[in-house]
Amino acid sequence: MPILRAAIMMDQTPNPGPENKISLMIIGAQKAGTTSMKNYLGQHPSLQVHPHKELSYFFDPLEYEKGFDTALRKYYDHPSASTQLIAKNAGLYVSESGIIRLKEHNPGCKLVIILRNPVERTYSSYLMEKNYGAINGTFESIEPVLRKGDTSDWRYEFFIGMSLYQTHLAMIYKHFPKEQLRIIRYEDFKARSAELCTELFEWLNVDASFKTDTATKYNVTHINRSPSYGRLVVQLLRNQNPVKKLVRKLMPGKMDYKVGEMLRNINKTNKLYGEIPESMSKLLREYYAPHNEKLSELTGIDFSDWNKPLTK
């Protein structure tokens, strides 16, 4: 019996969160299939997800100050007592203030985190930022960032720090009991995503016989047509950008988000990036190996295969 299913069968108590609270939060990891997970779970008639890629309410202090009722109107369409709210923010696992806000919102909230091989996650994160126009150099250009280890450097935090999972899980365990967090390996999610969704349906005490369509893969990083256009779109979509504020006032409901997605998609090609350079893969494997060992000790899950060369 899979570990996740066994744990779920021992915990079949209903979510104690009150009405219109988040029942389950996907908290990470960044570039680990979280958008796909959210959308797969959202197919269930007893669950409701937000169309936005991320729910920023717990992560963004300015949004949090406006209160959850405001966030509820922004992210969800007519939530009812008959459906449970599912949310996702792929960066929440690195934000202790965000985790604390989530606990204050619903101490009984169930958490899900998908952990991807840190070498792959680092490369995928780099490609995403390259598409956004935030970084122009080759992947090899982050080697000095890795060696310097400057945590005040955003490149270290985005590419390296977000892959040090044991540090972030130790922080999360300070605020939520282990039985409220489900850890899923990215390899398992890719291999049996429908089965994992069924196990999560059981955990949420909704009809687990519902069949999830997991054929579509979401948020795949493609090569952009124009780096300059990518940078412009990122600037336009920042919450504090006056143009975005104006668009929000003029467009009803969630149309501003849909416009943002349209602007991003215009710049995408059908081309995918190449494989990670082997020299960088080896360097990162050696760097992450002791961290992977600590992660295995903390979780009781074997992650030693992440120390091996990547398979093509």
Please state what every model-predicted region is.
Residues 1-93, 104-105, 109, 118-151, ...:
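PAPS-dependent sulfotransferase catalytic core
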Residues 33-34, 86, 102, 111, ...:
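Generic structural signal for small/hydrophobic residues in well-ordered secondary structure
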Residues 35, 93-96, 119-124, 190-195, ...:
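Short catalytic/ligand-binding loop motif for oxyanion handling, primarily in non-cytosolic enzymes
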Residues 49, 85, 110-114, 180-185, ...:
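A structural signal for short, well-ordered beta-strand segments and their strand-loop junctions
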Residues 89-90, 148-160, 275-280:
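Surface-exposed cleft-lining segments at the edges of enzyme active sites
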Residues 97-101:
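A short acidic, amphipathic alpha-helical/loop segment
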Residues 171-282, 286, 300-301, 306-312:
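The conserved 3'-phosphoadenosine-5'-phosphosulfate
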